[in-house]
């Protein structure tokens, strides 16, 4: 009897991607985050769709429409908080996923890696535009500050900012277009994720050792489907604990005040997942320099395959590189903390040192450590 899952044009694709896919036998829980990101995306699209049914993208009614969702719509409060905190879970999974790629040398698959970087940018853009939609104080001023950064671009900067705003300030036109883009982007992200997967399946997955696993493969189903389901259950558990017990933990109290262009909040800061980049931006006194550092702090990931000087792919057997990797993680946590602090002593100097350390680690110290480890292998 012919197996339909192996012959049907559509089922064949699903079968080759999620069922009969040959996977390394030794991939750890760090490989769970790809599937978790997929679940996060589906969850965000579904909750977002139901929110869009009740939301109005107009400056006069946006804030009250969100209030209406939370107070009057059946289970509107849980949909809204699942969407808001789902974004936080999304970024936690993203950072873990990227960190895994850096640690185990997954960036050697350059096409997969570069599409991943594009996905990261697209997700950050989507989250930023989504944060503007409730039209609270932090929404308005966050949008004003971040879009204004583009005015640092020589010659075309000012025109570009006014073009994005659709006027001379963040207003009705800005909110409407941000809603339109925020709605369409997740579907673009989903399409890019499929391309990401397509390129990954050209080479097969990496594994913790960084050594070819062609000699020892196991089918994705049932082994990794079960493993992924466990990850999904833990993700949903964490999300629901956040949503049901402390839904506003990661939000900003200022966003419960309707947007007022005449009143600037004392501390304008983005959501927690952008704070590390915001700290790097603020650590440079020059506007254009800050914007460049901000973009490069993420774009530097594209250089990872070029900066890899080690004879080994993974950091599993490279203690010096491991040490530097965890220093980098600590540095990013420091930057995240600094990004949420006011611009005053000693936070300014800590932020500047942490920013220098960030670029120094990636561009200089880690490639040097790899070279040292290569020489140690000769002993």
UniProtKB/Swiss-Prot annotation:
It is found in: Mitochondrion inner membrane. It holds the Pfam family Cytochrom_B_C. Its cofactor is heme b. Heme b b566 binds at residues 97, 196. One of its GO terms (cellular component) is respiratory chain complex III. A ubiquinone binds at residue 201. It is a multi-pass membrane protein. Component of the ubiquinol-cytochrome c reductase complex (complex III or cytochrome b-c1 complex) that is part of the mitochondrial respiratory chain. The b-c1 complex mediates electron transfer from ubiquinol to cytochrome c. Contributes to the generation of a proton gradient across the mitochondrial membrane that is then used for ATP synthesis. Heme 1 (or BL or b562) is low-potential and absorbs at about 562 nm, and heme 2 (or BH or b566) is high-potential and absorbs at about 566 nm. The cytochrome bc1 complex contains 11 subunits: 3 respiratory subunits (MT-CYB, CYC1 and UQCRFS1), 2 core proteins (UQCRC1 and UQCRC2) and 6 low-molecular weight proteins (UQCRH/QCR6, UQCRB/QCR7, UQCRQ/QCR8, UQCR10/QCR9, UQCR11/QCR10 and a cleavage product of UQCRFS1). This cytochrome bc1 complex then forms a dimer. This is Cytochrome b.
